[in-house]
A protein has these predicted regions:
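A short, polar/charged loop-to-alpha-helix boundary motif
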Residues: 18-29, 329-339
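Short, surface-exposed beta-strand/loop micro-motifs that present aromatic residues
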Residues: 307-316
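Short active-site loop at a secondary-structure junction
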Residues: 21-94, 141-149, 231-234
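Hydrophobic (often cysteine-bearing) scaffold residues that line and stabilize catalytic clefts
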Residues: 34, 38, 42, 152, ...
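Single conserved hydrophobic/aromatic residue that forms the stacking wall/gate
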Residues: 1-7, 11
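Short, surface-exposed loop or secondary-structure junction motifs
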Residues: 72-296
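Short, well-ordered beta-strand elements
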Residues: 317-327
Length: 351
């Protein structure tokens, strides 16, 4: 866990083990699969291209991926599965705010059932092949009309490749990782760093911790190079100190120790609400680009499937990051830690 406020490190602690069988403790430079905490990095990559005038958030996706020009929208008419044209064309903004109608396939709907059947993230293909296949599936709803967590940000990752002319990993490195000194963040773990990678756990039917053996989920274990499928929504491995640098850049409005990664306006767009209807199921919350926004405090946050979490609070000049590697039902440890930090700030500010 780590907490930084007003340029001061407040909390910097490590607890537990990264490998239970080897009794190996968490170290400062331990590496973690961050899963969906990849999404804000993809959003920043898109906004660096926006800053260069190479794309706009309200550009139609079909401008960069022509296959989406004919993508239909699912419509259930009198119990029959039909489709209709897009009333408002799908845009990059829709992709980054989960209002695209491109789901993961986790819910009970006809379109979700197609995604669940296809299992896109388990395929041996490139992000180009995956994206063009997605374009053949009807959107779950008309773009911009609903919120549904899904693969839209992976499609945005492919747009980064199309616009930049670079593979996603290379563009991340050039535009974000190198300027921020994020030397341990990438889509795979090279051989010389394999011993720093935390094991990924789940729980069995008796609630006992066991190693997760699903290699399709255990990303970042390949030692020979990046995977064929570079997912802008879930693919990165990172250290806590690396991700703190990314958060500090956003907190400081796109700048990191004199290096400007994003314009102030672009950083503001990332961390402010882009959904007029807010964040589905969470009163008082909105959604920025690839992250939630507290509509009262302006706090920007997100997390990953293995129970990693971060918060950036511009009002209190605060960053909080929590990492673990537990792929199971939701846990409250990160929220409890964050709540304790918030209570401490109230006490400090009242003195």
């Amino acid at each position: 866990v780590r907490s930084r406020r007003q340029r001061q490190m407040c909390i910097r602690d490590r607890y537990g083990l990264v490998d239970i069988a080897k009794n190996k403790p968490v170290e400062e430079q331990s590496l973690f699969r961050i899963f969906s905490m990849t999404k804000p990095i993809t959003a920043v990559a898109v906004m660096t291209l926006h800053d260069q005038g190479m794309l706009k958030l309200d550009d139609e996706v079909s401008k960069y991926i022509p296959e989406f020009s004919n993508t239909q929208v699912y419509k259930n008419f009198d119990g029959k599965h039909t489709s209709e044209p897009q009333k408002k064309q799908l845009t990059i903004r829709h992709l980054l705010t989960h209002t695209s109608g491109i789901p993961y396939g986790w819910e009970w709907s006809y379109v979700d059932s197609i995604y669940n059947f296809k299992q896109h993230m388990r395929k041996d293909w490139t992000i180009e092949e995956m994206t063009k296949d997605i374009a053949t599936i009807p959107l779950k709803f008309q773009p911009g009309t609903q919120y549904n967590y899904g693969l839209g940000i992976d499609v945005a990752g492919y747009i980064v490749e199309v616009v930049s002319g670079m593979k996603l990993d290379a563009y991340f490195k050039s535009a974000i990782f190198d300027p921020l000194g994020m030397d341990d963040t990438r889509f795979y773990v090279p051989k010389e760093k394999q011993d720093r990678l935390a094991e990924l756990y789940t729980r069995d039917e008796n609630d006992k911790l066991i190693v997760l053996e699903d290699n399709a989920i255990k990303q970042g274990i390949g030692a020979d190079g990046p995977p064929k499928l570079l997912l802008g929504g879930a693919g990165l491995v990172s250290s806590l100190s690396d991700y703190e640098k990314f958060c500090r850049m956003l907190l400081k409005k796109g700048e990191f120790y004199g290096k400007r990664v994003l314009s102030e306006r672009a950083a503001e767009i990332v961390m402010t609400n882009q959904n007029p209807d807010g964040y589905k199921g969470y009163p008082g919350m909105g959604h920025g680009l690839s992250g939630t926004v507290n509509l009262e405090s302006g706090e920007y946050s997100w997390g990953g499937a293995a129970k990693t979490s971060f918060w950036i609070n511009p009002t209190h000049d605060l960053i909080v990051i929590c990492y673990t590697q537990l792929f199971s039902k939701p846990t409250e440890y990160a929220q409890e830690f964050k709540a304790a930090v918030d209570r401490a700030i109230i006490v400090i500010d009242s003195d």
